[in-house]
Amino acid sequence: MTPPDNTKRPNELHILQARLLQLQRDREELQRLLNSRSWKLTAPLRRFTEWGRKVWPAHQAKEQTSMLPRGGIARHALYWKQATPCAPLLGQGNEIHLWTAQQGNAFFHEISQLLKCGLEDAGIPCKAFSASSMEDCLQQDDAKAAIRLIIAPHEFYHFIPEAEYWPLNRASLWMLNSEQAHTPWFAAALVHLRKADLVLDMDHSMAEQLQAQGILALHIPLLYSPSCRLFDGDLPIAAVPATEALPLQIRQWPCLSSPLSEALSQRPIDCCFFGTASERRSHFFASNAALFAGLDAYLRLESRNMPLQYGKNSSLSTQAVCSIIRRSKVSLNIHQSVHPYFEWHRIVLQGIWHGTVVISEPCTDAWPFRPDEDYIAASLEDMPTVLEYVLRSADGMRWAEKVRQHAWDTLTANSLAHRWKTIISLYAVRYTPR
């Protein structure tokens, strides 16, 4: 008879203790509120308010949105121009802790590393953690966080559901949303976003939509960090099954020190695309197969029903992807669906960062990057013609050179550290203890 496995029991007890502690705190807070004098005095007003909510739901929604930060603070948060000194962190600790689910999409681990570099550039103490279970969270958490930042909550709480009961130890709870409003992943994330003290969103329009729903949200564009080496593509392209079709001279093509050091026309790959397969994308590439057959193109559409994990369901790594883009003249951006969106990862981190010119479908607003100044905007129908013009005409290549130079200047002139300082300062101004 096999003896019972008691190795996990202490960890299960830790989780139960955390849940009980949180429930006890909630109960004490509720009891304090029910016994307060203000609660008893406002009982008639609450009854009247409940009646009003039943007969006038539209007015209720208006009341909720009227309290949102739509004034100067929010507007300054979304479009800041002057330098803002960084306020001290709030909470018991003095660090920002960034958390991702280990089983989650590789993109979110990359974003976590970029955000961490931006914080370090700003002189803000921080740590990045990746956990696969509640046991991992409890083992790694050192209770020194003033802010706990959950990246991609739709994934984090899916893989670690017990984290909903994870005590904050007086830290503020922040979340980074990356999902578009029309996706089921956003619906899954919204439940958790409502519990956050602050939500950061890479998309400006999504930050505004969250504010309209009564959620304190700020825009955090994925900007430049000079200390982040994760996206360097200077190394030769790794020889893996996904790249074995590339000639050796392309894989080992030497890169100069700066992405703009060599002329765009000298790069050996004409265009590239990396993305998840969708009916829309597949139809575009199939319809233009003759065009791409005549180009030195690297196109990779992957079908997955699980998060992208390099080395598991993809043989490409971050470095391999960046090395291919670093050797490409054009990086294409095609939306997965008909809903427009600014794909920060593909356009900025995998495009502009490597000195390639990005040709993209029209996107949502994404300060500081502007269409036809920092990337070439073209409809799906016009994209083949624009691509041919850039690659096969001298005027088109000069235009592309001008756009990529402007994009590089925009990228390097706007630091992620500056944005972090602004966010911390704005949150400190708005913060009120709960």
Annotated model-derived regions:
Residues 1-77:
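Boundary detector for helix-to-coil junctions that initiate low-complexity/charged tails
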Residues 12-15, 41-47, 104-115, 280-284, ...:
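Conserved alpha-helical elements of sugar-nucleotide-dependent glycosyltransferases
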Residues 78-97, 137-141, 255-266, 322:
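Short boundary motifs at domain starts and secondary-structure transition points
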Residues 80-85, 95-215, 229:
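Extended catalytic core of nucleotide-activated donor transferases of GT-like folds
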Residues 103-105, 133-135, 153-157, 178-182, ...:
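Short, solvent-exposed loop/turn segments at secondary-structure junctions
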Residues 104, 164-287, 293, 415:
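Catalytic core of nucleotide-activated saccharide and alditol-phosphate transferases
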Residues 296-311:
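Glycosyltransferase donor-sugar binding loop
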